[in-house]
Amino acid sequence: MFQEENVDKRVESILSIWKEQVGVELRNTISYLSRHLEEVELMNTNGRYSILYTIKTDNGEILYYEGGNPKDEFNNEELEKSWDKIPSTIRNFYRTVHNGFYFYASQSMGLVPLENVTFFDDDEWGIIEELEEPLQIDLQTTFGFFKSGMGGYVAVDYKNSNNDNATLWWTNKEPRYNMNFWDIVDEWIVIGFEV
């Protein structure tokens, strides 16, 4: 793909991977990228390859997103133990599209690399003591795959993840349970493009 000198062909090539692998799950993201993706470039950072996406917004601002290499070594011990229990659509994204896709400057507003997926049982969540309703996830089986950069996570409790069920988790307000993982992720990525 990166031996291709024509930028439009490189862009179309990467978008074809997205369409083939997550065309339903991330349809709004793909639609936005189809209209706004200006360039894709191969990056090598300390021997790790990734793709830098150059996105031009409606107001002319240039944003950079990074898509990690799906062939990267798995570097998250807790997640690796439970990987086969994570919904197949999520595993498919990480295996075939990218090991994370996020706003380059903040490394947020997107799906984080596997090494940065949050294992909820490792963190202190002060919000738990303040919840009005009983906690509906098990911290020992919950992982945050998407970080908003402002205290928001899209998290999956693999004990309750049928049909890509997820929790919209906040560090400072009530969580929202039984949400569709891909609906939230797709919407939040596009919001990140437009902010």
Predicted features and spans:
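A surface-exposed partner-binding patch
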Residues: 1-152
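A recognition module on extended beta-rich or small alphabeta surfaces enriched in W/G with H and D/E
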Residues: 135-139, 143-195
